[in-house]
Amino acid sequence: MFKRLTVVLLATLALTACERVDPNSPLGQRKAIFKDMLNTSEDLGGMLRGRLPFDGMRFAEGAVKLDTLAHEPWQHFPQARDGGGSSARPEVWERQARFHDLARQLEGVTGELVGVTRSQPLDAAGLKAPMDRVEAACKACHTEFRNH
């Protein structure tokens, strides 16, 4: 009985280890950046939709963080498709010009969002349209290039 349990536990551990992504790999690095982008975007959107209290300074800081993050993940997409565990469709590598075009669009709209936050005090209503453009840029890339 003990021997059988040991075999099952070792097999489970081996399978779990196979599913982990090396955090230093290109896949691991871009996943971490995208997760940080998602969390930051959700906080900003939450402030504009009333899920979180609106704090102009915090929103402005989050916009700068999101803009910085928006420039980072693209360097972690290698020229050739990487291994399993990626949510990226093969089209990322097959249509790189379009992929990079959408990346530049995201960088542009996050930069615009930062620009709007420079005029204090911030008005949540005035931030809705620029934030909507950021979310639309994210969605456009996900629709074309991400497996859901």
Label for each model-derived stretch:
Residues M1-V7:
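Bacterial N-terminal signal peptides that target proteins for export
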Residues A14-A17:
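C-terminal motif of bacterial Sec signal peptides marking the signal peptidase cleavage site
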Residues E19-G56, A63-H148:
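Sequence context surrounding c-type heme c attachment/ligation sites in exported
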